[in-house]
Amino acid sequence: MLTHEQIRAAKLVDNCLKDKIILVTGAGDGIGRTVSLFYARYGATVLLLGRTQSKLETLYDEIEALGYATPAILPMDFAKATFAQMNELSLLIQKEFGYLDGIVHNAGILGALTPLEMYDPITFEEVMKVNFTAPFMLTQALFGLLMKAKSASVIFTSSSVGAKPRAFWGAYALSKQGLEGMSDIFTQETQNHTTLRFNTINPGATRTNMRAHAFPGEDPNSLKTPEEIITPYIYLMTDDASGVKGQVIDCQPK
């Protein structure tokens, strides 16, 4: 089994994602945006899913201008999305591409940083829907397309508060704990009779808008950029990582 350090230091060859069809959620901002750009750079056709059409269009234009494979724009707000809409999305991808090589579940919201005894139930429900329930529904809706690929890879995005719950992080921490458990269960249910692989990535402290909102007094220049922690996201989508299953991988040494 590869160590986290080996995965972080993996050598990536040009076009290592050539001809792969990969869906990235939360593609309009932060880590999702960077992941999408790098996947395109390494040869993938990227399906850009996010809630803000204008941000997806800007990213689409950027990928096109760089001469990479033409991406697709898939607007969807996880806070409002239904399972029926996700099934419609699956049919659309089936018609256009026929299969799906991977999903990066990156979309997420922070919610409130407050004691659970004071946590607004409506906010709690929204955070759990966006961060936990929607990734489950989307994975289930796209499962058949993943099975049609040679060796599909699903990546969930966790957090340090997913591995170790922390006071005041409420629904966000609980949703990330849930994702790590979901990845583990999917792995146990598929690893012996399919080529599917499920893993979770903990990006660590990264220079994003969400991080700035959670830690407003923190110097952003003290943090790694998404570009600096990108290697595990790319490696786990390559065929070389076909044996990596059920892992929670830290992008930054602890």
Regions found by a protein language model. Give the residues of each.
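C-terminal helical subdomain
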Residues: 2, 7, 196, 200-201, ...
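Conserved glycine-rich cofactor-binding loop
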Residues: 21, 26-30
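Rossmann-fold cofactor-recognition segment
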Residues: 66-82
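Substrate-binding pocket helix/loop in short-chain dehydrogenase/reductase
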Residues: 89, 114-116, 120-125
